[in-house]
């Protein structure tokens, strides 16, 4: 449950709120069936990806940690967690502090939740802000 709370919090409020630019290497590359010439800057918007209904379901704008607990198998959980971890970038450009950040997330959520009563709460829809 702790993992689900952390990943859902990270999904709803990613640490990086910008584009993740990359430059297409020499010779160009094919992306989603389209040729992209070398030197072209391409970007991924992590914030949009983390609110994608295709990846996180029709309630992607709702904070609902249970989405990580309702998956059918471990592979689906790992896949969803990897999608959330895109908030830290990917490949050789991934944030070197990712592991430290997750360690701190676990510590903070554990310590803060220790003094709270365990009652169910209403979901909060960020789209209504």
Regions found by a protein language model. Name each.
Residues 98-129:
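Cytochrome P450 heme-binding "Cys pocket" and the immediately downstream C-terminal segment
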Residues 32, 69-105:
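Cytochrome P450 heme-thiolate "Cys pocket" and heme-binding signature region
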Residues 6-10, 64, 106-114:
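Amphipathic alpha-helical interaction motifs in eukaryotic regulatory proteins
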Residues 1-32:
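Conserved cytochrome P450 K-helix E-x-x-R motif and the immediately C-terminal K′/meander segment
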Residues 43-44, 87:
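Structural recognition of the beta-strand scaffold that forms the well-ordered cores
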Residues 44-76:
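Conserved cytochrome P450 K-helix/beta-meander segment immediately N-terminal to the heme-binding cysteine loop
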């Amino acid at each position: 449950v702790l993992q689900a709370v952390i990943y859902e919090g990270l999904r709803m409020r990613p640490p990086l709120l910008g584009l993740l630019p990359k430059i297409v290497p020499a010779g160009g590359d094919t992306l989603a069936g389209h040729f992209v010439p070398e030197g072209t800057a391409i970007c991924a918007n992590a914030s949009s990806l983390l609110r994608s209904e295709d990846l996180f379901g029709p309630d992607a704008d709702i904070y609902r940690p249970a989405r990580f607990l309702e998956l059918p198998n471990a592979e689906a959980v790992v896949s969803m967690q990897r999608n959330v971890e895109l908030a830290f970038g990917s490949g050789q450009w991934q944030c070197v502090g990712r592991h430290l950040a997750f360690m701190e997330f676990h510590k903070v959520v554990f310590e803060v939740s220790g003094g709270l009563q365990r009652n169910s709460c209403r979901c909060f829809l960020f789209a209504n802000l």
